[in-house]
UniProtKB/Swiss-Prot annotation:
It comes from Candida glabrata (strain ATCC 2001 / BCRC 20586 / JCM 3761 / NBRC 0622 / NRRL Y-65 / CBS 138). Pfam families: ALIX_LYPXL_bnd, BRO1. Residues 854-865 have a biased composition (Basic and acidic residues). This is Vacuolar protein-sorting protein BRO1. Residues 735-751, 812-826 have a biased composition (Polar residues). Gene3D superfamilies: alix/aip1 in complex with the ypdl late domain, alix/aip1 like domains. GO terms for molecular function: deubiquitinase activator activity. Residues 543-578 form a coiled coil. The lineage of its organism: Eukaryota, Fungi, Dikarya, Ascomycota, Saccharomycotina.
Amino acid sequence: MKPSVIGLKCKDTDKVDWKRGLSSYLKRIYGSRQWKEFYDEQLCVEMDHVRNNANGELGAVTLVEQNYKYYAYLEQLYLRLGNNIGQFKLEFTWYDAEYGLVSSPTKHTQKTLVFEKSCTLYNLGVALTEVANEKINEDFKTAMVHMAKAMECFRYLSENFFNSPSADLQTENTKFLSDLSHAEAQEMFLINAINNGTSEKQASLISKLAYSGSNLYENCWEFLRTEEGGLTPYGEARWNSIVSGKHHFFRSLAAYYNALALEQNNKYGEAIAFLKLATQCLSSSLPYKYALNDNFDFDGFGETIKDKTKQLIKDNDYIFHDSIPQSVSLSSIKALDAIKAPKWEEQLKPFMEAIAHKCEKLYRGIVPMEVFEKESIYSEKKASMLRQCINDSETADMEYSSFIEFTHLPNLLSDLKRRYKSQNFSGTTDPQGDMMRDQIQSWIKSISQSKYKDPDEQLKLISSKKQEILTLLAGLPSEQKENVVKLKMALVEAAASDEKLFSLVQPYAAQLRLLKQPDELWKIFNMFSIDESNKQSLLDIDDSKNQEILAKISDIEQMAEDLRLLKEERGRTLKELKSQTNDDDITNTLLVNSKAESEELEVIFKKELDKFKPLTTRIEATIFKQESVVNEVKNELDNVFSLSGLENKTSEEEEKQKKRKEFFMQIEEAATKFLIFNNDLPKGLEFYDSLLKMSKDLAVSVKVQNNASGSDNNSNNGYVSGNVIPPSLPPQPRNVGSSIDSQFQSMNLGSVPTPQRFPQPPAPNSRPIVSMENYTSQFSVPPAHGDLPPAYNQVPLVPTRNYDQPHGSGNYPGNVSSQHPVSSSPIPGAYDQVPMVPPKQPPAEGRSQISRQEQMEREERELQRDPTAFYKKSSVFDESLYSRYSGK
């Protein structure tokens, strides 16, 4: 016997131009200027080529590979676009497979990517069955694997693609093709077991396999069977005969081999009954013999059953006398399905991975928003991990630098090594004391050079700045209440920061005072020095331990070198970690897992972050090793000092050493806190300077606005008393100080906004703070009144500065040659002429005289309060200046 496979036919298709579709999509999305940044013509051509190959006249094995590859391209695109492929404006045309007597296949055209995927998957299943049919006689295992894959393709198609217009893709038809492929794969396994020469020994196994195969073919027969004269639901009419014949033949095989198994178990009566059942099933398959005669030997198998039945009946009659059941059923046999098809996702995975890098380039302009959101979550987790590594690394580097700086380790080791090598002990025998002296001297120098060495003085300076700010704010009108509140809130926050900052140094006022008075400090420090006058000369001390001391110094030098190498290694590893995190991209992973829930996403993120574990572990290892080496260095230094004989001290000397160490630690703590204070205080002072400047600007702006209001009144009075109206200029902003918010947004306690060199134009509908530096060119427009002439309510021309005109030419200050009209509206009469300076006439009424006198007194008071106000106010529209300095 040999297995047979029903031949399936592929679907035909029309050509699709992916190159045109992708380019037109990118042009619509990114515009004609940028679309080429996301377009790769070579990869588009390659995708078109793969589709043509997948539907070409190639060998079955090549067709399988090309269809897998093309489906992977489609799946990658589907992960990005979903069902929005209509934006590509492509049409996919496919024809139904040509089964039976159909003269012309049905044509179906759709614009959905799902239709293209389902048709490709159908052709892939067909190609897999062709490969299985080719490999049946050459390689049974390969054939069975390909048939199992085809079964899974059709199963996936039936469960995931619905409502297709094509008959080939309808759910019931693809379900039938899946069952058919399953049955044929089971058939291959069964016949291979029968043909291996040990079928009788495996009779029980073969009976289970045969019964399972008969059940699978029965499912196919149930789908294909029709009433007499009816049409086959799908495929060709001969398929019904093939499926029915195999169904009955495999039932016969199952009964026969079950009888052999019963005979081996000494159940001769049941064995005879199953042999009779095998004969009946074989008889049922004979009508379909013509369809399977090339593969199955019906006559030979019938003779085998007949001979075996005669033998068992004879043995039972003469020897065993076992009762024969009247009827038996195949249901007593436990069916065994030998086919385990790989999941579709597992089949596609290697091809998805193979083209992933190409699709990242090909589809880089097509990324859904959901993926961007998930990428941002992952990026934050990655950034958090990187920040932690950076902080740990910087802390370790700081600890290393502090240890080297505070111990002066290189100089200390060099000095000790030189002394013990040359046996020159004429200097001090107290290296710890030398180290302390050097360190204290460096602190004294740092504090003496600091501009902020007196915290009390700095506190007074801050208090004076705060008082000045509060004084300025107190003088502001109620209209500026909102800005005043904001500035005062900033002062409160700054005060809290000041309290924390000054609390660092206040507990160490005594130590800082000593550091600013070196003579007094050294006097105290020398009180703890050891009196060497009564000690034995070091020249008389046994120097037999010199070599041991030098060896320990060499060990310490090696440890110091190890510390340096650890720091460099940590820096290199951190740099590599930054590079890898920057280059890391999980877009493709998120696309593949686009339907993952939040819990699944957390697992994916954790797995992706594990990629950086080797680098983060190396950084942690260098930090741990550094701490260990630092402790070893400290211990070895103590051993060196002990071997030097410095440990043989009296109780009084030990007490002095202890007190000196305590004193040094106090000075060290004070110096450390002062360094922090010295670094942070300038930021606070700059912050107060910024608040003060903002307060001054606010006060000056309010003052200037008040002056501008006075100018408005003067202009109105000039119109009433005279016949000439001064030209109106663009309106001045009224709500002063509303840009305080923007200034606060760009300023905090750690940084002060840099003042702009040039004034910026105000934003629409905003009312910025007015600076006195550029206020000389800003004036207020007199309000329009209904009782004024109509021409006054129109926008007048800005006067042209014509120095050739005799009237009023000497009364206009400035060097501007001309000005252009601010409006094109015609203004009749006197408004077309250059406005004249109001004539200097004495007031006709006492009321005008009193008003002018009050105005002059008010301006005199303003000049006394602000002597520079005179230079900040233009004289063009202040007619009082002419009378004030005219001697009248």
